[in-house]
């Protein structure tokens, strides 16, 4: 899959789930399940409830995503 196919949206962490999964509420009100991208995992980026994040979604499954950035 090409990088251009991903949809990037802003959201807020609602809940922390097992296995570094998170429930994220997007700006448009949808709630998705997201995991941390590999680079964030490698650099030990901590994500807590209430953090503002950028989530990448694929057009094929809009209920799952990947967290690629945590705002300060």
From Swiss-Prot:
Q: Where is it mainly found?
A: cytoplasm
Say what the protein does.
One of the essential components for the initiation of protein synthesis. Stabilizes the binding of IF-2 and IF-3 on the 30S subunit to which N-formylmethionyl-tRNA(fMet) subsequently binds. Helps modulate mRNA selection, yielding the 30S pre-initiation complex (PIC). Upon addition of the 50S ribosomal subunit IF-1, IF-2 and IF-3 are released leaving the mature 70S translation initiation complex.
What GO CC terms are in its UniProt record? cytosol
One of the record's GO molecular function terms:
rRNA binding
Q: Name one Pfam family in it.
A: eIF-1a
Task: Give compartment(s).
Answer: Cytoplasm
The record's listing under CDD domains reads:
S1_IF1
- InterPro entries, per this entry? NA-bd_OB-fold, RNA-binding_domain_S1_IF1, S1_domain, TIF_IF1
* SMART domains registered for this protein in UniProt: S1
Task: List the HAMAP family.
Answer: IF_1
Family assignment from sequence similarity: Belongs to the IF-1 family.
In this protein, which residues make up the domain named S1-like? 1-72
Q: Which Gene3D superfamilies is this protein grouped with? A: Nucleic acid-binding proteins
The record's gene field reads infA
| Subunit-level organization | Component of the 30S ribosomal translation pre-initiation complex which assembles on the 30S ribosome in the order IF-2 and IF-3, IF-1 and N-formylmethionyl-tRNA(fMet); mRNA recruitment can occur at any time during PIC assembly.
By what name is this protein known?
Translation initiation factor IF-1
Q: Which keywords belong to this entry?
A: Cytoplasm, Initiation factor, Protein biosynthesis, RNA-binding, rRNA-binding
